Structure formats: structure tokens, C-alpha cells
Curated annotation (Swiss-Prot):
Its main location: cytoplasm. This is Glyceraldehyde-3-phosphate dehydrogenase. Its EC number is 1.2.1.12. It is an enzyme of class 1 (oxidoreductase). The active site is at residue 151. The keyword NAD applies. Pathway: Carbohydrate degradation; glycolysis; pyruvate from D-glyceraldehyde 3-phosphate: step 1/5. The record marks 178 as: Activates thiol group during catalysis. GO terms for molecular function: glyceraldehyde-3-phosphate dehydrogenase (NAD+) (phosphorylating) activity; NAD binding; NADP binding.
């Protein structure tokens, strides 16, 4: 089945979700809304991307609509989500990627325009969070607004799930070495709530907070209260890496842990958890669609109960693909219940 989808917010994630949708067999984008971009500029921004290259396809503007690979995509510029006429386009599933409407109450505004479900492409304080490969099977169709969690949670959770299922995690600390994002500054500037975050993104390694590790406890209840973490924002434009240092319940050699992750990457988590023994660096994974790519050669073990595991993620491309995978999963569930 093909799901008709609308996107609200045509920023980094909105546009990368759109690019991924062109390749996704289950999804058709029929409408986009962004109050800050007019259609001609949206065409330009979708066509040319400094990180992911030129769009592989055709894009034109016809009146106020985009024509992408010959198909019409309605383009709206509404500031109020409840005013977007999703019903007119047939869009039942909405990707909420503004970064502004991240609570159930705010994102529910889309339902007034005819949307059936809203998937927030960010963590949410109150909407149920789902991570593909980890807890999507707990979806029961009751919530009209759900969250795809964060890119870092999507990287960490599959890794933590395999390790916890096989060996048990007593406790763990996560560090994500994260590429800079749109919220940061090109040169030093005001950032009242996060002084360090206001420093020049391309000049500094910037310690930062992240709720990604604690959020794993929401998608894997067994790990609730057992993980926390922090971030370093670094001067790279895309691709990030998670370092999970954890204490294991059952003793296991590093080789045994590697084997378990390799098996999962070829089995139940294929397409979500990748595995590599190559001598890779971050740019090698630009455009990788996995949520998490375990780097077998980068991790270390102090003893059979204390281990550091390293896993990469394209924080734009891989995450955006999961947004669509979750959306597709939810639509299929809804159609059969």
C-alpha cells in the first residue's frame, strides 16, 4: 500500500525526509507546508544540498505547487498547522518536522485539517515514542500523535537492545560526538540558555546536553534509569557517532559481543543496525540509511563485564528514513485494525 503523506516544516529533516520518500516504496509525498519558504525557493533548496548533493530527479514549480518527478506536490505557507488543508490533498499521515510543534497538544492541530496521524520528527515530552527495530510493535493505534524520538536515540537504542537482550546492561554512559546542526551559530553569538552552544560551530568542540540516552529507557523499559549521556558538538556537517560504555550483567568477551551484533545486523535488525569491520571515518557513512552502524574495530573492552561500544549514524539521512519506515509501519497497522 502507498501512504499519502504531508510534511510540515521544510528544513533539514523535512527536505531529507522528502528525498528519502522518493526512494521509499510505501510513501508518496502529496503536500508540503512551510510559512517561511515560497515555492521557487523550496524547489532550489530541495534540488541543491551541500551535504547530500544534487537531487536525483526532476523538480519544477507550477503556480504555487511543486512538480517532482512528474507528480504534483501541493505547497502551502500556513503558519497555523490547523489551517493546512491536508484533506484536500489526501494526506492522512503528517511528518511534523518544524521542531516547534513537539507536544501532543500542539501537533494535534494537524488533525483539524483532515490528518489521521502525526509523526513528530523529534523527541516529545508527552507523545509515545517509537524506535524502529526496538519498540514499534508496541504501537496500538490509540495515539493520533506519535514521535520518532531523536536521531541519537535511534542510533543508541538498537545497539543497547541487542547488548541488553544478550548480556544484560547493569548501567551505562553514552557520549555522542555529534555534527553541528542548524540551531548552532557560524560565529560566536547570543545563546542565553546554553552559553557554550552560542560559540562558533566550525571552530569548537562544544560539550552539550542530550536526552537521547534517558529516552532509551522510554523505548526499552528494562533500561529505564540505567543509561544517561552527554554530547560533544564537533565541526563536521553530518554523520555522528555514539560511544556507549556499559557494565554487563553476564560476562562476555569483546569478540562475543561483536558476534551478537553482527548476527542481529544480518537478521532481525537488518537495515536498521549495520555492522562494519572496515577502517571507516565519518564521511564514509554520509547517506547511509541505517539507524546505527556498529564499528567493530573502534570499540574496546577493559574486562568481560566492562566495555565501550562505538556506533555511527547519519543523523540526517538514516533518521529521515526511519521516520518514513515508522510512518509506513503505522499506516499498515491502521489499515489492518
Amino acid at each position: 500500500m502507498t501512504v499519502k503523506v504531508g510534511i510540515n516544516g521544510f528544513g533539514r529533516i523535512g527536505r531529507i525526509v522528502f528525498r528519502n520518500a522518493v526512494e521509499h516504496p510505501d510513501v508518496e509525498i502529496v503536500a508540503v507546508n512551510d510559512p517561511f519558504i515560497e515555492p521557487k525557493y523550496a524547489e532550489y533548496m530541495l534540488k541543491y544540498d551541500s551535504t547530500h548533493g544534487v537531487f536525483k530527479g526532476t523538480i519544477q514549480v507550477s503556480g504555487s505547487d511543486l512538480i517532482v518527478n512528474g507528480k504534483t506536490v501541493k505547497f502551502y505557507t500556513e503558519r497555523d498547522p490547523s489551517a493546512i488543508p491536508w484533506k484536500d490533498t489526501g494526506a492522512e499521515y503528517i511528518v511534523e518536522s518544524t521542531g516547534v510543534f513537539t507536544t501532543t497538544e500542539k501537533a494535534s492541530a494537524h488533525l483539524k485539517g483532515g490528518a489521521k496521524r502525526v509523526i513528530i520528527s523529534a523527541p516529545s515530552a508527552d507523545a509515545p515514542m517509537y524506535v524502529m527495530g526496538v519498540n514499534e510493535k508496541t504501537y496500538d493505534g490509540k495515539a493520533a500523535v506519535i514521535s520518532n524520538a531523536s536521531c541519537t536515540t535511534n542510533c543508541l537504542a538498537p545497539l543497547a537492545k541487542v547488548v541488553n537482550d544478550k548480556f544484560g546492561i547493569v548501567e551505562g554512559l553514552m557520549t555522542t560526538v555529534h555534527s553541528y546542526t542548524a540551531t548552532q551559530k557560524t560565529v560566536d553569538g547570543p545563546s542565553a540558555k546554553d552559553w557554550r552552544g552560542g560559540r562558533g560551530a566550525a571552530q569548537n568542540i562544544i560539550p552539550s546536553s542530550t536526552g537521547a540516552a534517558k529516552a532509551v529507557g522510554k523505548v526499552i523499559p528494562e533500561l529505564n534509569g540505567k543509561l544517561t549521556g552527554m554530547a560533544f558538538r564537533v565541526p563536521t556537517s553530518n554523520v555522528s557517532v555514539v560511544d556507549l560504555t556499559c557494565r554487563l550483567e553476564k560476562p562476555a568477551s569483546y569478540e562475543t559481543i561483536k558476534a551478537a551484533l553482527k548476527e542481529a545486523s544480518e537478521g532481525e535488525l537488518k537495515g536498521i543496525l549495520g555492522y562494519t569491520e572496515d577502517e571507516i571515518v565519518s564521511s564514509d557513512l554520509n547517506g547511509n540509511a541505517n539507524s546505527s552502524i556498529f564499528d567493530a574495530k573502534a570499540g574496546i573492552s577493559l574486562n568481560d563485564n566492562f566495555v565501550k561500544l562505538v556506533s555511527w549514524y547519519d543523523n540526517e539521512w538514516g533518521y529521515s528514513r526511519r521516520v518514513l519506515d515508522l510512518l509506513s509501519y503505522v499506516a499498515k497497522y491502521d489499515a489492518s485494525h
